[in-house]
C-alpha cells in the first residue's frame, strides 16, 4: 500500500473536517497552503517527494482510535506520541462539546506536526479544498449545536412573541429558546441551561473606571446605588446604577436583568428615563441611564415639607399630565410599572442656554411637552411586568392597590393609576401614607387623603376617581392624557374644531342650494353651433362653442341673438 492509500485511509477513519483548527493555527495553515499552491511544478514535486519520505504523524489521542499496525507506530517518533490530548476550542461563541466528539478532533497544541496538518488541509494536487457549499456539507452542524448556541443569548420576556419568532427563525428551522426548553430533557443535555441567564462579565479592566468619571453619589434604592458620572468620551453626564447584590446572592438571575429587559423594550420616550447601556462587572449589574438634573419628586416634596410649602394645583396638574403620558406609553407597550411613587419620578429642568427666546411651533399636539421648561419622567422599572403574562412583584405597600394584594391581575394598568393618584396626594401636601392597618384600608375604600390646600371640584373629583375601589372604573392613562381638566386648551381646541366642522357643513349646504337654483333659472335662448354656423337652438345649455378651422374650439358670446365677430 503506497502513501497515497495510507493518507486516504487515515482521512476516512479520522473523518476530519477541513476547517481550521483554531483561529491562529488556521490562519498559518491557509498562508502555507497558498504558498504551496503558488509554487512551480518542479518545487511542488520536490515538496511531494519530501512529504512521501515522512510518514503521517498522529497525536496520541488519535492513535488509540485507529487500529493501525505496529510498523506504522514504530515509524512515529516518541515525542509525537507524547503530544497532549486535544480539546475543543472554548470561546464565548462555542458551547462545550460532548466528550465523544472531542476524541475525533485533531490536536491544536503547538507540537502538532505540521506535515499532518498540511496533509489534512492540502489536497494531493497541492490546492486548497473548496470552501463552497459542497465543502460545508462535509461537516454538517447538528441540531444540538444549534440549540446550545441559543444558550448564549438572553430572550427578553417583554419582547412580543411575533418579534421573537421573527429574529430567531432561520429559514423556518430554528426554534426559539422557550420552545427548546419545552422540548424535553434529552435536548437539554447538549448544554442548554433550563432557565438560566447569560451574565458574562467584561474581559477588560473595570469599564466603569475606564469610561466614566464618578462625580458623586445621588441616591440609594432597593436595587442599588446610583452615581452621577461623566463619560470620558462624550463629556455628557449620566446616572450609573450599580446593583447592591451580587449575582451569586440573587435567588434568580432574571431579577438582575429585569430592569434591563424592560428598558430595552420600551425604547425612548420623553416621559420615561432613558436607558443607554448595561453590563456585568465585579459580579454586579451596572446600568447606564439618563441623568435628571432636578432629582426625584420625593426630594422636591421633602424640601417643600421643610419649608412648609407644597405644590400648587397648576403644578400638580402638570405632574399628573406628564406622568400619564409616560404611563400611556408603557401600557401601550403591553407593560405595567407597578411601583409608581414620588421616589420613582424624576425631574429634568431645561437649561437656560437651551431656551432661544423664540416661540416654538408644535406641529403635533402630542409634542407640546418639548417646549416645557420642566419635564417629569418615570424611572426604576425593577417591578415592571407584562400585562399578558404577568409575574407580579409587589411594590411599595403605601401606593399598592388592593386588587394587587388580592392577586387580581385583570386590570393591571389601573393599579398604576391608583398609585399615581396617591402620588399626587403626597405632592399636594398629604401626610405620610400608611403602610397597613385601618388607615390603609380606609384609603382603599375610595377616601382620598386629606391635603392642606383647597383643590378645585373638577380636579378633586378626578383624583378621587383615580383611587376608587373598582379598578375597572378608574380612568386609563390615555383618558387622563386627554382630560380637559388637565388640558383646558385641548377642550377649547376641540370646541373650535366642532364649530369649524359645523360651519363647513353649513357652507356645503348653501353651495348645493345655489347650484340647484342656478340650474332652475338657466336661460332658454342658447344656440347650438355646428361646422356650418348656427343650426338652431339648444334648450337648457349654458354655453355654446364654435369650431374654427374644423379643429379648434373657442367660446363665443351672443348679444341680442347676434354672433360677436372674432378678432
Swiss-Prot record:
Active site (UniProt): 339 (proton acceptor)
Residues carrying Phosphoserine: 76
Biased composition (Basic and acidic residues): 1-12, 25-35, 42-51, 64-77
Keyword Magnesium in annotation: yes
A GO-annotated cellular component: cytosol
PTM (free text): Phosphorylated on serine residues. Phosphorylation leads to increase its activity.
Tissue: Expressed in oocytes (at protein level). May also be expressed in testis.
GO BP terms, alphabetized: female meiotic nuclear division; female pronucleus assembly; mitotic cell cycle; negative regulation of oocyte maturation; positive regulation of phosphorylation; regulation of fertilization; regulation of meiosis I
Domain Protein kinase: 212-486
One Pfam family linked to the record: Pkinase
GO molecular function, one term: non-membrane spanning protein tyrosine kinase activity
Annotated coiled-coil segments of the chain: 494-519
Task performed by this protein: Oocyte-specific protein tyrosine kinase that phosphorylates and inhibits CDK1/CDC2 and acts as a key regulator of meiosis during both prophase I and metaphase II. Required to maintain meiotic arrest in oocytes during the germinal vesicle (GV) stage, a long period of quiescence at dictyate prophase I, by phosphorylating CDK1 at 'Tyr-15', leading to inhibit CDK1 activity and prevent meiotic reentry. Also required for metaphase II exit during egg activation by phosphorylating CDK1 at 'Tyr-15', to ensure exit from meiosis in oocytes and promote pronuclear formation.
Family of the protein in this entry: Belongs to the protein kinase superfamily. Ser/Thr protein kinase family. WEE1 subfamily.
Disease note: Oocyte/zygote/embryo maturation arrest 5: An autosomal recessive infertility disorder characterized by oocyte inability to exit metaphase II, resulting in fertilization failure.
Protein name: Wee1-like protein kinase 2
Gene: WEE2
Amino acid at each position: 500500500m503506497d502513501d497515497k492509500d495510507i493518507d486516504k485511509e487515515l482521512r476516512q477513519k479520522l473523518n476530519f473536517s477541513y476547517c481550521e483548527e483554531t483561529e491562529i493555527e488556521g490562519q498559518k495553515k491557509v498562508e502555507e497552503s497558498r504558498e504551496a499552491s503558488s509554487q512551480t511544478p518542479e518545487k511542488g514535486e520536490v515538496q511531494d517527494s519530501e512529504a512521501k519520505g515522512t510518514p503521517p504523524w498522529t497525536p496520541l489521542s488519535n492513535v488509540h482510535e485507529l487500529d493501525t499496525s505496529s510498523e506504522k507506530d514504530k515509524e512515529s517518533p516518541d515525542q509525537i506520541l507524547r503530544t497532549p490530548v486535544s480539546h475543543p476550542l472554548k470561546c464565548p461563541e462555542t458551547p462545550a462539546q460532548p466528550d465523544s466528539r472531542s476524541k475525533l478532533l485533531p490536536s491544536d497544541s503547538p507540537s502538532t506536526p505540521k506535515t499532518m496538518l498540511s496533509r489534512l488541509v492540502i489536497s494531493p494536487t497541492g490546492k486548497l479544498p473548496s470552501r463552497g457549499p459542497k465543502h460545508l456539507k462535509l461537516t454538517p452542524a447538528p441540531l444540538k449545536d444549534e440549540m446550545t448556541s441559543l444558550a448564549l443569548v438572553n430572550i427578553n420576556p417583554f419582547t412580543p412573541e411575533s418579534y421573537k419568532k421573527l429574529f430567531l427563525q432561520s429559514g423556518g428551522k430554528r426554534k426559539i429558546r422557550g420552545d427548546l426548553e419545552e422540548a424535553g430533557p434529552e435536548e437539554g443535555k447538549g448544554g442548554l441551561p433550563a432557565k438560566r441567564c447569560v451574565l458574562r462579565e467584561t474581559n477588560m479592566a473595570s469599564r466603569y473606571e475606564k469610561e466614566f468619571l464618578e462625580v458623586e453619589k445621588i441616591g440609594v434604592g432597593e436595587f442599588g446605588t446610583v452615581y452621577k458620572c461623566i463619560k470620558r468620551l462624550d463629556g455628557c453626564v449620566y446616572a450609573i446604577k450599580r446593583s447592591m447584590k451580587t449575582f451569586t446572592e440573587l435567588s434568580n438571575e432574571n431579577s438582575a436583568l429585569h430592569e434591563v429587559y424592560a428598558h430595552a423594550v420600551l425604547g425612548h420616550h420623553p416621559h420615561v428615563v432613558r436607558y443607554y447601556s448595561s453590563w456585568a462587572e465585579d459580579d454586579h449589574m451596572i446600568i447606564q441611564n439618563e441623568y435628571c438634573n432636578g432629582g426625584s419628586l420625593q426630594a422636591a416634596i421633602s424640601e417643600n415639607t421643610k419649608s412648609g410649602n407644597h405644590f400648587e394645583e397648576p403644578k400638580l396638574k402638570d405632574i399628573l399630565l406628564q406622568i400619564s403620558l409616560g404611563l400611556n406609553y408603557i401600557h401601550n407597550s403591553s407593560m405595567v410599572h407597578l411601583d409608581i411613587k414620588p421616589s420613582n419620578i424624576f425631574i429634568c429642568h431645561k437649561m437656560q442656554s437651551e431656551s432661544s427666546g423664540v416661540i416654538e411651533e408644535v406641529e403635533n399636539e402630542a409634542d407640546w411637552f418639548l417646549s416645557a421648561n420642566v419635564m417629569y419622567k418615570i424611572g426604576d422599572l425593577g417591578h415592571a411586568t407584562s400585562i399578558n403574562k404577568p409575574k407580579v412583584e409587589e411594590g411599595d405597600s403605601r401606593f399598592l392597590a388592593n386588587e394587587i394584594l388580592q392577586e387580581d391581575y385583570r386590570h393591571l394598568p389601573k393599579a398604576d393609576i391608583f398609585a399615581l393618584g396617591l402620588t399626587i396626594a403626597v405632592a399636594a401636601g398629604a401626610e405620610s401614607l400608611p403602610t397597613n392597618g385601618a388607615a390603609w384600608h380606609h384609603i382603599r375604600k375610595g377616601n382620598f387623603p386629606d391635603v392642606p390646600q383647597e383643590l378645585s371640584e373638577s380636579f378633586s373629583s378626578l383624583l378621587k376617581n383615580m383611587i376608587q375601589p373598582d379598578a375597572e372604573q378608574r380612568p386609563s392613562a390615555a383618558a387622563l392624557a386627554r382630560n380637559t381638566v388637565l388640558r383646558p386648551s385641548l377642550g377649547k381646541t376641540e370646541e373650535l374644531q366642532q364649530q369649524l366642522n359645523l360651519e363647513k357643513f353649513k357652507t356645503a349646504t348653501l353651495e348645493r342650494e345655489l347650484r340647484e337654483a342656478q340650474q332652475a333659472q338657466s336661460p332658454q335662448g342658447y344656440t347650438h353651433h355646428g361646422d356650418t354656423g348656427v343650426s338652431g337652438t339648444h334648450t337648457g345649455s349654458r354655453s355654446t362653442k364654435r369650431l374654427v378651422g374644423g379643429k379648434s374650439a373657442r367660446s363665443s358670446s351672443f348679444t341680442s341673438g347676434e354672433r360677436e365677430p372674432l378678432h
